[in-house]
Amino acid sequence: MPMETETNQGDLIFRSKLPDIYIPKHLPLHSYCFENISEFSSRPCLINGANNHIYTYADVELTSRKVAAGLNKLGIQQKDTIMILLPNSPEFVFAFMGASYLGAISTMANPLFTPAEVVKQAKASNAKLIITQACFVNKVKDYAFDNNLNVICIDSAPEGCIHFSELTQADEHDIPDVKIQSDDVVALPYSSGTTGLPKGVMLTHKGLVTSVAQQVDGENANLYMHSEDVLMCVLPLFHIYSLNSVLLCGLRVGAAILIMQKFDIVQFCELIEKYKVTIGPFVPPIVLAIAKSPVVDNYDLSSVRTVMSGAAPLGKELEDAVRIKFPNAKLGQGYGMTEAGPVLAMCLAFAKEPFDIKSGACGTVVRNAEMKIVDPDTGCSLPRNQPGEICIRGDQIMKGYLNDPAATTRTIDKEGWLHTGDIGYIDNDDELFIVDRLKELIKYKGFQVAPAELEALLLNHPNISDAAVVPMKDEQAGEVPVAFVVRSNGSDITEDEVKDFVSKQVIFYKRIKRVFFVETVPKSPSGKILRKDLRARLAAGVPN
């Protein structure tokens, strides 16, 4: 049955194949996540992969409330912002959930940012307190001192800093009585900045409750998880994909969340085997490492039943390789964007009652939401199988960009549609295929060349372990596609061999004109290729 309707404006709107469900949007995020805690209060909630310490659901809920009281004691009030500058750790969870109980906002920053980047975000978000680790204190010390901010450390606190235990030892009954509105902001991630400057994305209690429910609630949940599951949390929690689809979804269903501080293939496999991990939310770089590393074969990974990856091209051969490594897993993709809360589409093979899916699709629009595909030039909605800009509407999308109404208006139109800047199409089976970023298309004499398509081809070559394609200026064509390629271990593949491999498979204007061999392809924490860095290298004339 086709899930599409036409509106009075002539818009063709696509919906999930799953029926809409009741979503308790009135609940604050913490109340929603812990709503069914009585069913699993003594079960493991967080497992710290670094030291094997296990926190039960009762521990996590109580500690989060203690942290809320502790933050309040330090002067943090409702609608204030705290900055969490941490790698994955139980304290990250306690800080985020604690702020929610208080009606405060968490802005999450990558601890590997430069001091200037951290300070920029702390300033822009008006953070009133910073939670970090001793090794990162130097990045914020001067700013915190100049602005009279408390810095809290989760490990040995240097002079002038407060130890995290001061928060966890507070009396949970001291949380002030706050009335949280569903439209209040709870999380303030900064969008990746792959286009323009990073901006604070205001995600509300209602938005995140809706997004989690769209994934894991309902009789036939789109992303089926339960309290017997063990989720691998290796993606950084400061990124919304991990925060939402791993932490918040995991808490909602009562699953055990196994926290890994950073990806290391050996430790990763050891933890999967030891704790019998069942669900693996990954990004393409991790999928690539799993598929191409011989180490993986030494471990029993048969417990994994779900492997989901972000919507970047994996390529058919890569998918097949992952299937061999995880013999019992369903492999599929989701599609997200920070501003959309972040999940727009989710693979229906992950549903409790699964659907058949096609290789390369990145899911079907989530339930309780609407999607349309529009012509980027005219704004008119397009029928099935025609690529255009993906737009989404629903309660899960951001409230807007912090202090940037102009950027908000450019992104969310008057009808409430969020314009993603991604190009894709919906096929006859309601599956979404991403063609590319609107802003990343290469224009060869007016022909559109999608980098993602060429990258998928390159990744299928056995002697290529990673690749990125970007435009290079060309006098005659305007732009031509060039590739940055990482050779597989021991390979001595040449530029001509790479070019020939691609040219046999594509139309003339998609042929790669130059190949630059590099050690690594630069990527954001969420796994997106940092194309602007590669373009800058080309412009500077130093491609390698």
From Swiss-Prot:
Function summary: Catalyzes the formation of CoA esters of trans-cinnamic acid, 4-coumaric acid, ferulic acid, benzoic acid and caffeic acid.
EC number: 6.2.1.12, 6.2.1.-, 6.2.1.25
Pfam families documented for this protein: AMP-binding (PF00501), AMP-binding_C (PF13193)
Taxonomic source organism: Petunia hybrida
A GO cellular component entry from the record: cytosol
Entry's localization field: Cytoplasm, Cytosol
GO MF entries: (E)-caffeate-CoA ligase activity; 4-coumarate-CoA ligase activity; ATP binding; benzoate-CoA ligase activity; CoA-ligase activity; trans-cinnamate-CoA ligase activity; trans-feruloyl-CoA synthase activity
Description of pH dependence: Optimum pH is 8.5 with cinnamic acid as a substrate.
Tissue expression remark: Mostly expressed in flower organs, with highest levels in corollas, and, to a lesser extent, in tubes, sepals, pistils, stamen and ovaries. Also present at low levels in leaves.
An example Gene Ontology biological process: ferulate metabolic process
Protein name: 4-coumarate:CoA ligase 1
PANTHER family reported in the protein's UniProt record: 4-COUMARATE--COA LIGASE 1, LONG-CHAIN-FATTY-ACID--COA LIGASE
Top-level EC class as recorded in UniProt: ligase
Keywords: ATP-binding, Cytoplasm, Ligase, Nucleotide-binding, Phenylpropanoid metabolism
Reaction(s) catalysed (UniProt annotation): (E)-4-coumarate + ATP + CoA = (E)-4-coumaroyl-CoA + AMP + diphosphate; (E)-caffeate + ATP + CoA = (E)-caffeoyl-CoA + AMP + diphosphate; benzoate + ATP + CoA = benzoyl-CoA + AMP + diphosphate; (E)-cinnamate + ATP + CoA = (E)-cinnamoyl-CoA + AMP + diphosphate
Xref: SUPFAM superfamilies: Acetyl-CoA synthetase-like
Subunit structure of this chain's protein: Monomer.
